């Protein structure tokens, strides 16, 4: 998979007059991240998960728009590349977007990450671009593709709930793996509209199911939030995440035991 992604990224860059002689894969998971060395550009290339044909181009367009808006407001986000059209581009069955290279991944300082997430929310508070409401439509589309089962139905019922609170533009998947040192938040592909506590649910979920101290610290550093609304948002976010895990299982069978454990936890707390 990563070899195909690298070839696609290098080819599109070359079409724009930019040559990468030494590309290197930074990450191969939901997306393949390719540093197009020696260029200060990272290509994010669709891996086929959860969409075998790549994510809808509208999702990538929304991501670039939201990240660009936050960057112009001075928020701590990875900006799109300004050396070529950031995309989205299609090549060899992949969907590709180009971003500024900000250095090698290192451990993120959680206090700074939490504070930066609040600043992003402040920057996006007046964003008026079209965004989906939470991940409701995405969850329905994902569960429609899965073989019917009690687990799938359970996730669907949880995930279509609509928490209260004041809605605004959100990151959409604000766990610490989507924050680079700096800190710089990235991966706005699932940007959506909802209460800020929906973003905080990603940090709370990592704390709850993995006893992840950095996530707990980041949540504390974020500052004031509605704890009851966060508790309302958490299972809605978790249902979307675990439905995505189900789609990924054919390519990433190692997720199977993790998914089973997470579903038991979700049923024990929210069934």
Place the predicted regions along the sequence by residue:
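ATP-binding glycine-rich phosphate-binding loop
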Residues: 16-37
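Conserved short submotifs of the Hanks-type protein kinase catalytic core
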Residues: 92-104
